From Swiss-Prot:
Stated role: Cyclin-dependent kinase that phosphorylates the C-terminal domain (CTD) of the large subunit of RNA polymerase II (POLR2A), thereby acting as a key regulator of transcription elongation. Regulates the expression of genes involved in DNA repair and is required for the maintenance of genomic stability. Preferentially phosphorylates 'Ser-5' in CTD repeats that are already phosphorylated at 'Ser-7', but can also phosphorylate 'Ser-2'. Involved in regulation of MAP kinase activity, possibly leading to affect the response to estrogen inhibitors.
Taxonomic lineage: Eukaryota, Metazoa, Chordata, Craniata, Vertebrata
Encoding gene per record: Cdk12
Subunit structure, interactors included: Interacts with CCNL1 and CCNL2.
Residue(s) carrying Phosphotyrosine: 73
Entry superkingdom: Eukaryota
Binding sites annotated in the UniProt record for ATP: 729-737, 752, 810-815, 1036
Protein name (Swiss-Prot/TrEMBL): Cyclin-dependent kinase 12
Intracellular or extracellular location(s): Nucleus; Nucleus speckle
Domain Protein kinase: 723-1016
Residues with the Phosphoserine modification: 235, 248, 264, 273, 275, 300, 302, 309, 311, 317, 322, 324, 331-333, 337, 340, 342, 344, 382, 384, 399, 419, 422, 610, 640, 677, 681, 885, 1049, 1079
Any one of the GO BP annotations: positive regulation of transcription elongation by RNA polymerase II
Species whose genome carries this gene: Rattus norvegicus
Residues carrying Phosphothreonine: 57, 511, 688, 889, 1240, 1242
Bias-annotated ranges (Low complexity): 286-304, 312-349, 1465-1484
Catalytic activity: [DNA-directed RNA polymerase] + ATP = phospho-[DNA-directed RNA polymerase] + ADP + H(+); L-seryl-[protein] + ATP = O-phospho-L-seryl-[protein] + ADP + H(+); L-threonyl-[protein] + ATP = O-phospho-L-threonyl-[protein] + ADP + H(+)
Amino acid sequence: MPNSERHGGKKDGSGGASGTSQPSSGGGSSNSRERHRLVSKHKRHKSKHSKDMGLVTPEAASLGTIIKPLVEYDDISSDSDTFSDDMAFKSDRRENDERRGTDRSDRLHRHRHHQHRRSRDLLKTKQTEKEKNQEVSKSGSMKDRLSGSSKRSVEGNDDYGKAQLSKSSSKESRSSKMHKEKTRKERELKSGHKDRSKSHRKRETPKSYKTVDSPKRRSRSPHRKWSDSSKQDDSPSGASYGQDYDLSPPRSHTSSNYDSYKKSPGSTSRRQSISPPYKEPSAYQSSTRSPSPYSRRQRSVSPYSRRRSSSYERSGSYSGRSPSPYGRRRSSSPFLSKRSLSRSPISSRKSMKSRSRSPAYSRHSSSHSKKKRSGSRSRHSSISPVRLPLNSSLGAELSRKKKERAAAAAAAKLDGKESKGSPIILPKKEKFEVKESGLESKKLPRGIKSEKSTPDTELVNVAHSNTEVKNCLDTGKVKLDENLQKHPVKDLKAQGTKDTKPVALKEVIVTSKETETSEKEALPPLPTITSPPPLPSTTPPPQTPPLPPLPPLPAVPLQPPLPPPQPPFSQVPVSNTSTLPSSPHPRTSTLSSQTNSQPLVQVSMKTQLSVTAAIPHLKTSTLPPLPLPPLLPGDDDMDSPKEMLPSKPAKKEKEQRTRHLLTDLPLPPELPGGDPSPPDSPEPKAITPPQQPYKKRPKICCPRYGERRQTESDWGKRCVDKFDIIGIIGEGTYGQVYKAKDKDTGELVALKKVRLDNEKEGFPITAIREIKILRQLVHQSVVNMKEIVTDKQDALDFKKDKGAFYLVFEYMDHDLMGLLESGLVHFSEDHIKSFMKQLMEGLDYCHKKNFLHRDIKCSNILLNNSGQIKLADFGLARLYNSEESRPYTNKVITLWYRPPELLLGEERYTPAIDVWSCGCILGELFTKKPIFQANLELAQLELISRLCGSPCPAVWPDVIKLPYFNTMKPKKQYRRRLREEFSFIPSAALDLLDHMLTLDPSKRCTAEQTLQSDFLKDVELSKMAPPDLPHWQDCHELWSKKRRRQRQSGIVIEEQPPSKASRKETTSGTAAEPVKNSSPAPPQPAPVKAEPGPGDAVGLGDITQQLNQSELAVLLNLLQSQTDLSIPQMAQLLNIHSNPEMQQQLEALNQSISALTEASSQQQDSESIAPEESLKEVPSVSVVLPPAEQTTPEASNTPADMQNMLAVLLSQLMKTQEPAGNLEENTSDKNSGPQGPRRTPTMPQEEAAACPPHILPPEKRPPEPPGPPPPPPPPPLVEGDLSSAPQELNPAVTAALLQLLSQPEAEPPGHLPHEHQALRPMEYSTRSHPNRTYGNTDGPETGFSATDTDERSSGPALTESLVQTLVKNRTFSGSVSHLGESNSYQGTGSVQFPGDQDLRFTRVPLALHSVVGQPFLKSEGNSNSVVHAETKLQNYGELGPGTTGANSSGTTLQWGGPAQSFGKPYRGAARVPPRGGRGRGVPY
């Protein structure tokens, strides 16, 4: 058996592996003859084998060619072994592994065969080599026995080893029998292949190899079949291989081996006869490689395999390498190993291509292929294509191949001599090395075997010996390759094996030794290769129980030269290690394959690194010592152990150098990330821990981060000290947000701090999510994360002391919530279009990337001063897969923006949830406040139901499936009244809002559809003028909250009264139809006429904040009674110190107002007079608005501080005037009473004072600090004053106000929100719009209310007084309007509660505005509508509800209480729901 094995092995090595094809070998030629023929005709046999492969499957050849790249890649991973023809080598390696397991002598023979190969007289040399190989096989078997396991055990392992991990002794006998069977089958196959090529038959003749392989093949067969199935080109070879294996282990292996051999590119290249056949073999080899698991099994299967493998596998590493079954046999028998070596060149060449794929393997194969090439050029010709790819991809490998060739030639000579001598007698060094390599390899594999037992047999065998390391490399590569490309791998291995066998016989032997040494060294620290080899050997024994191979240890000393080469191995192992992961049996086989293939690919450093890396990867318990796994990687790198054999030390070094170049190659795979192959990807990681890996890692990581535009700087490497912290701008779920400036660039950034102190689980999941998602989102409407920095100078400090790190974002000046709540800005319809367009574009982008934001709200929508919108805060975002049905949490999205399906418990939601949130924001942009404000889920659903209708199966069929449908039903069924409530917004916007707030998520429009809506489709952002945002103040949520708290604490109290008044209005609106219904009450604006006084108060919101209700009342009385009120008087009344500028402005205003008053007396068109007035007062500031607006400009003329006060007063006066008429305006300016109706203009005036009229109104007023409250004038005074004012206003003003109210268009949205709101509330009331939050206000009205909140707050008393005076004295439309006015005021006072107020909009004097407008409308005849308007205003002017309430309640109650008790109750109702009651009017 050993002999047949050897024959088979030799045949594999020379004929089977080499591909020496002796057609005359016939199935039944004597093994020795055939072996000789094979040896001599190894190349021919290869070519014939290739032809046979072609015969077997023309597809195989073509596929081999086609699959070549893949195979090459796989081979590259295995190529790194040592052969330029990695494919052949890999198949050969596998075979060699088997052979190694079978015989070290086989290995020696292979080496000799390699020498012969190098001698271009392959036939003669191979014949002699065959004889020598036969002898060597015998001696090799003895060697194996000496090594500590007989060839038989190797054979047995080969036979059953891959399939089962049997004891070496039992396996030896088995392998003998199997070898005989295999030999017969091989012979039969060869005779069958005879037609194709005698060389094939000769290959068959060495059935002993195949026999040995047959078990291996059996084990391989599944893989090979698998591989074959994977790669069709292998299908012939693979099929025959698999079939043979399946049919009869012996024969199948033989035939398979033979087929593999035939197919093996090695045989083809040796044959040199056919490049296509070579390709076929390549495919086959790929297949074989696929079966690499088999070779692995074999390796791991038998200790003898290990021992023999040590020398054989080194020489037979080629066979091991070649995926072909015979390749395994090679591993089993020395001869096969040798031929495998000669074949190897072809394999190597394929491997070279493969190398290009996998740097580690590439390197190995290139150096090995060099040796092989010198041995067998003919094969190379066929392999040439593979080589070229290898060369092109691995130029270093070419040089290394040349060196290897030279070394192989030298080794071949030595091998020839050694071969002639008994394998044991081989030059002691070489022989010893081979032996030692085999033994050591066996040791490791044995240990691995023991651990891995049957399943890991392949892997174990691979690891069995350093020689086996070659096989392991082959196997690992094969496995990896199998994983990557099963058939191509086989072919590559077969080719590589064949090619390398003749040329690399010596190389194989040397490689075995080297592999042994390097493996040993690799196993321990690769660095200590020369001296450490024994240590590694010792270490491997722990891995591999067989320490017996002490001779290998001496060999290792002989191999000291090898250790230096081994470091390259070590480096190569890294590559192998990478490959390893992909291999089916990663532990053992991977280790060895890593070791073998990687040395070539990676330099010693790399090898060392890879060894270290490999160790972690190698899970084999048999490889307990860390060094051992590296060794295996080294072996794998040495997968072309031929290179690593005793002669190969120098070659190995050369390979190492080349591998260094190959090391560079691994970098390319890095870029893809795992593109070359899973091994490659792992390789970078494995290498990463070591020196080279680090280099690779940065390259990998940087590009990754570069995806996030961070290519320039590595994330996490900078310290937060690089930034100057300017201030805190927000608070998030896991830290604060700071405004900062980059010290280097001067760029403003936002730093989001993430604390790790209190994190039980380390890094906060929300931060991880945000980082991960933001790196994938690059869009102009999505906030850009620039980098990540830490608060430590050194990353090591971060580990010691858990600090914080910061996400660095581009800085945005404002967020939408801060702007809306500030009242500093009024957005026009164009601005809203621009904002919504950008918002929906960003959301559509996220949804198309399959991300749900799940937290869209105003505070997460950022703006800069140029009007650019960005979506921020992706801490709750997640990847959305429409196909997966897994549930998500429904506790997402802030309650006010949460869609009904989440409120009802839906857990399988869609991107429609984000569209609902954006619909809420669209409504909020028009109403200036959240449209659904509740603090409980049930209450939120109630608010949604009131506006959008109750969820029911009629409109939402799937609602009945939701978990909480029955438990959270609204108290009553509501019909959908969204269109009525929002009738004041443009129809296109209303349509869009209607679609976005559809209850049924399946019918709700998508983000993409919103962009195609009439409202947004024609929006051109580039042509949009940026909104006039406050550049002096960054409006963020945190700032807004602080401001709100301040108002509530003291400033707000005064501010609140106006808010209360406005709230009253809002409340009344709410009462009518809680906030939402209030809009239908628009008729109430008539009372607003009488209430213009309150309107004025709202205009005076800021001043009102400063003044008491009584003071406001006095001021209103004064203003009303005295048309020629001097600024000093006003200042005194208000207890305000006015600067000269303010006084001048006020005087100018008064004059203009008086003029206007006269004009208004003459003309009922307050509009015309108002423009005059505005021109007179503040032409520059005046905006082209209705009279009220113009008045506002006047107010705006006033300086900032006094401006605010004057603006409040003037806005009140002007508002009153505008609504009332020119005369009324004059009266209003001088008298608060008349101003009540004109309150809208007054408010604008205040705005103008604080800021440009448009922007200033509400927002600037809030900034205005409330002055000392003026002495409260007695209510009677107010009444008297009011009477005087009404007298002035009576006919003309009333008419003007009525006209204004009836003609809301008179107040263009353009004018300040106050004016707008005052008039518009009336308009809307008249229209019976459901102006909820805005209530009466149109878009402008809402803006007005927002702006007026402060005015309202500051002048609630004034407004009420004005309204009262106006009502009483004016007798506008009659006592009804008078009463209506009082009522609305009364209601305002009583209804508004600071708690109910929305502080965000307290400044907005909507209520006042609505009141102002309402008195007129009320005159027209709807006290209810007045109340509604008030309610709306109240909601908006929550800030000053308290003050307004007190003032208005006191004053208003006196004369307004009796008038309309109805208004009050209405307001009460409205007031209670101002927030939640009105869907739109809910205070923020």
